Structure formats: structure tokens, C-alpha cells
A protein has these predicted regions:
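Exposed, low-structure sequence patches enriched in small/polar residues
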Residues: 1-169
Length: 169
């Protein structure tokens, strides 16, 4: 027999007409007995990891924030018809037990994007750039304990141009 319990909360808030936020928190628990009568349990929840092993953090909702109206800023208004800045965070903690003994724990911290910019120029060009930072801490227990940390830095950029109208031959 296996059992599952899920809970999730989502919300958003328009702080001003130009600043919009969203928040989400989820928790999942699965437990039961396998064919050999070994009790297994896995828990996953939104989490802000801290410390070398990630476990010094605290449960925390993920968030996103978007600033629109950036095209009105002095340096930007000369070139942009519209512009926005965005930022987001999502963190996870996943822990697994066997017969009530912790076997693994994994912590992920994802700033995606840490900073993102989107802009449409007055000449028909759209530009988008995003920088993301993702750190994963993977802990193994029982026998030989180990901790593996991986950090990925990603920068993406794209541009598009469109022209409307006809042409003469």
C-alpha cells in the first residue's frame, strides 16, 4: 500500500500597475510498504536551501516579480517602445527514507531568471536576455556519506526583427 498527501498554495499581488508578483508553495508526501515490507517515504516541498548540505534553509514559497513600464526610464525611453524586467526563484527540498532512516536529500535553488530583460524597440526589433543561476546539492547517507554540489550559470539572449508593410518592384 502507498499513500500520498499533496498541498499547494498559489497567489499573486499587483503591488502597483507596473509591479506584479506571484507566489506558490507546494508540499508532497508519499509513503508505504514495498513488497519486502520495507517502509519507504519521500517528501518534497518548496524550500530556500542554505548551508553546505542545503538543509540549513527553511520552507519558503517560490516567487516571481515583473516590472513593466521600464520604457519610461530616461535611458530606455530613447530606444524602447516597451520594456520589462523580471526575476524569479524556486527552491526544492526532496528527502527519502527507508525504514525511517534518511537515505538521500536533494536541495535545488533556482533563480530563473536571476535577471531577465525584454524590450521592443521603436524600429520593430524585440530583444530578450535572461541570466539564470541553479544550484543543486545532492546528499547520500548510509554506508559512505557523500555530498555533491553542482552550479549552472546560464545566459540566454535572443533578438527578432519584423517589418510590416509592402514593397514596390
Amino acid at each position: 500500500n502507498h499513500y500520498k498527501k499533496d498541498i499547494a498554495f498559489r497567489s499573486g499581488l499587483a503591488i502597483t500597475r507596473q509591479i506584479n508578483t506571484s507566489f506558490n508553495f507546494a508540499r508532497n508526501k508519499v509513503w508505504g510498504l514495498d513488497g519486502n515490507q520495507v517502509r519507504t517515504e519521500t517528501q518534497t516541498r518548496d524550500f530556500f536551501p542554505k548551508g553546505i548540505m542545503g538543509n540549513k534553509g527553511l520552507p519558503m514559497a517560490g516567487w516571481s516579480i515583473r516590472f513593466t513600464g521600464v520604457e519610461k526610464w530616461p535611458l530606455v525611453k530613447k530606444i524602447a517602445r516597451s520594456a520589462s524586467i523580471e526575476h524569479g526563484f524556486n527552491g526544492k527540498e526532496t528527502r527519502a527514507w527507508q525504514n525511517r532512516s534518511l537515505q538521500t536529500s536533494k536541495y535545488t535553488s533556482s533563480f530563473s531568471p536571476l535577471l531577465g530583460i525584454s524590450m521592443s524597440s521603436k524600429k520593430g526589433t524585440t530583444i530578450s536576455s535572461r541570466y539564470a543561476l541553479v544550484t543543486t546539492v545532492d546528499n547520500r547517507f548510509g554506508g559512505i556519506n557523500s555530498t555533491r554540489v553542482r552550479t549552472d550559470n546560464t545566459w540566454t539572449a535572443s533578438t527578432n526583427y519584423s517589418h510590416r508593410g509592402g514593397f514596390n518592384i
